């Protein structure tokens, strides 16, 4: 089947749009960077699905970050995605977390932050409390309050054919459409019947036909979704020289090198004293170049 793909579709006679995302490798890359507890893996999968679905609603080049913050065992869980559906994510937690821990058991008292950053134009940030039993309900509340467009989400994570999968669907009323509330309710009822194994295992066209074969559905060209971190040795070197020089050389004197670790992909970049000196020489306008 086609996985790591987002499909957009339109109910031509009902003034409702939809999205379907099916992920395996992109999800697996994110949860393999650390030894995340099972419940945190699930939460990251839900955030990943949510971010890809919301990013697909962008009508411009830019990115969306969906972030959970709280005072519970999980202090942070965040996924970032852009208009090219390049995604990355990370979570921070302390202590033991039960496999079946709920959103509120993990996050405690917290909130959801959605940040939209166009390449051109103003940055937008929305903050909502964790009102709801799960992430799906929190996001639907966000849509109700901010977009004021009737929106429903279905988000699933789990094992399929021995590997972690994450998938989801979104349906949303088209502004100024000619459809009736009954149309949306009709599609809600149909989508409520979707099973995990269908989301994880069926091709998009087969799944959409299974759900909506009585309706006229136009499916657009699929868009691939891929893990992309964006870290590099060059960026790590640039970060080092923003730190007080004396502090960096104290570290070098103590351990012989300076290392930066990327939380998103798990890569560690290590610089010895010669390389650090070259970084500072380059930054001060010297002729030496770091390779």
Curated annotation (Swiss-Prot):
Pfam families: HSP33
Single GO biological process annotation from the record: protein refolding
Organism field: Vibrio parahaemolyticus serotype O3:K6 (strain RIMD 2210633)
Disulphide-bonded residues: 229-231, 262-265
Post-translational events: Under oxidizing conditions two disulfide bonds are formed involving the reactive cysteines. Under reducing conditions zinc is bound to the reactive cysteines and the protein is inactive.
Stated name of the protein: 33 kDa chaperonin
GO cellular component, one term: cytoplasm
Alphabetical UniProt keywords: Chaperone, Cytoplasm, Disulfide bond, Redox-active center, Zinc
Function: Redox regulated molecular chaperone. Protects both thermally unfolding and oxidatively damaged proteins from irreversible aggregation. Plays an important role in the bacterial defense system toward oxidative stress.
UniProt xrefs under PANTHER family: 33 KDA CHAPERONIN
Transmembrane helix listed as a keyword: no
UniProt record similarity statement: Belongs to the HSP33 family.
GO MF, one example: unfolded protein binding
Cellular localisation: Cytoplasm
């Amino acid at each position: 089947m086609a996985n790591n793909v987002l499909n957009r579709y339109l109910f031509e006679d009902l003034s409702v749009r939809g999205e379907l995302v099916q992920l395996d490798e992109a999800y697996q890359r994110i949860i393999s960077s650390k030894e995340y507890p099972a419940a945190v893996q699930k939460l990251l999968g839900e955030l990943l699905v949510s971010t890809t679905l919301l990013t697909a609603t962008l009508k411009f080049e830019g990115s969306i970050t969906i972030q959970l913050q709280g005072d519970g065992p999980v202090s942070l869980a965040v996924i970032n995605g852009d208009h090219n559906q390049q995604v990355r994510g990370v979570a921070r937690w302390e202590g033991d977390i039960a496999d079946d821990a709920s959103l509120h058991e993990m996050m405690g008292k917290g909130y959801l932050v959605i940040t939209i950053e166009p390449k051109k134009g103003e940055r937008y940030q929305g903050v909502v409390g964790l009102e709801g039993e799960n992430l799906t309900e929190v996001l639907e509340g966000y849509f109700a309050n901010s977009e004021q467009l009737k929106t429903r989400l279905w988000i699933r994570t789990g094992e399929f054919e021995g590997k972690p999968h994450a998938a989801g669907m979104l349906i949303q009323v088209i502004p100024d459409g000619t459809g009736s509330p009954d149309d949306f309710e009709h599609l809600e009822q149909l989508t409520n019947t979707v099973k995990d194994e269908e989301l994880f295992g069926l091709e998009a066209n087969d799944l959409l036909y299974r759900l909506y074969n009585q309706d006229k559905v136009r499916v657009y060209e699929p868009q691939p979704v891929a893990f992309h971190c964006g870290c590099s040795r060059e960026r790590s070197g640039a970060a080092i020289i923003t730190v007080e020089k004396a502090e960096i050389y104290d570290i070098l004197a103590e351990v012989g090198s300076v290392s930066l670790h990327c939380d998103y992909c798990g890569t560690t970049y290590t610089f010895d004293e010669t390389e650090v000196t070259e970084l500072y020489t380059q930054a001060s306008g010297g002729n030496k170049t770091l390779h």
